[in-house]
């Protein structure tokens, strides 16, 4: 109460220093100018308008920041990487040699990314091949190109499947975790374009023929059942995927792929870039 009374007293003291002048505002001709001791004369109505505009600008800036966060910010803030170097990946820094399989796959990735700029394009894409050939690099590049160019703006997200499952499992014993199964299924199911990176790794670290757990398949089904625009990278062939996942889940993964020629395949013709060190 003492602070409030002091504040009111200070305001009244300030008001006592304001003098009304005989001159009128050129804009608000019915309003006399006033002057605060030691300051230039001003029009109260002009001052109020200036304050209102400043407040409106603050609100608009906040709204714009929230808008950008809801779309462009999703890729930057909500993506789940297990290799943070992938954040730097673009089409421009994807290294290839002319007339190679990798160069052809780069071109195809650019073309498919262009298709995803059409919101009516409903099909998944699978990028398959051995580890280290650049599958994830291409997927991130495609995602960035769409996120930057699509109109109107749309949310895009990159998620390492293995890391996703680890974080969801950790949430079981962590009250208040943002990585609950329900939240992640909702987030991944709702973005415009999603990358599921390294699909199959969550089941194949121990044995390539090991079936993915029922819980993992339920989580993946919950995500893919809500979607029709997903980029999937995997080290596995369709035959190997069939040993890991049940047919209902596979049908969600392969949605629209055959019709749209949506497979980018790396063979032994493309070497593991991470192994070429000398």
Task: Report residues per predicted region.
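Pre-Walker A (pre-P-loop) alpha-helix and adjacent loop at the N terminus of AAA/AAA+ ATPase modules
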Residues: 93-125
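Short glycine-rich substrate-engagement loop in P-loop NTPases that contacts/grips substrate
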Residues: 103-110, 147-190, 211
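Walker A/P-loop nucleotide-binding motif
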Residues: 121-140
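Active-site signature of alpha/beta-hydrolase-fold catalytic machinery across serine-
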Residues: 141, 145, 222
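Loop/turn-to-beta-strand initiation segments
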Residues: 155, 190-193, 226-232
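A short, basic N-terminal segment
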Residues: 1-104, 268-278
């Amino acid at each position: 109460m003492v602070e409030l009374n002091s504040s009111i007293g200070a305001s009244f003291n300030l008001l006592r220093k304001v003098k009304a002048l005989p001159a009128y505002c050129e804009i608000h001709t019915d309003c006399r100018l006033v002057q605060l001791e030691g300051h230039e004369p001003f029009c109260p109505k002009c001052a109020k308008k200036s304050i209102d505009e400043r407040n409106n600008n603050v609100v608009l800036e906040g709204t714009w920041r929230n808008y950008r966060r809801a779309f462009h910010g999703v890729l930057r803030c909500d993506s789940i990487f297990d290799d943070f170097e992938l954040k730097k990946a673009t089409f421009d820094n994807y290294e290839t040699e002319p007339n190679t399989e990798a160069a052809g796959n780069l071109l195809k990735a650019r073309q498919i990314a262009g298709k995803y700029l059409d919101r009516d394009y409903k099909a998944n894409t699978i990028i398959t091949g051995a580890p280290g050939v650049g599958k994830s690099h291409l997927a991130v590049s495609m995602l960035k190109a769409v996120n930057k160019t699509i109109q109107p703006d749309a949310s895009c997200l990159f998620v390492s499947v293995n890391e996703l499952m680890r974080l969801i499992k950790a949430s079981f014993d962590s009250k208040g975790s943002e990585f609950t199964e329900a939240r992640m299924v909702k987030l991944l199911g709702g973005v415009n374009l999603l990358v599921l990176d390294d699909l199959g790794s969550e089941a194949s670290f121990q044995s390539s023929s090991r079936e993915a757990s029922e819980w993992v398949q339920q989580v993946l089904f919950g995500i893919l059942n809500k979607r029709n625009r997903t980029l999937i990278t995997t080290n596995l062939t369709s035959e190997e995927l069939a040993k890991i996942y049940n047919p209902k889940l596979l049908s969600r993964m392969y949605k629209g792929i055959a019709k749209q020629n949506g497979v980018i395949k790396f063979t032994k013709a493309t070497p593991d870039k991470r192994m070429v060190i000398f």
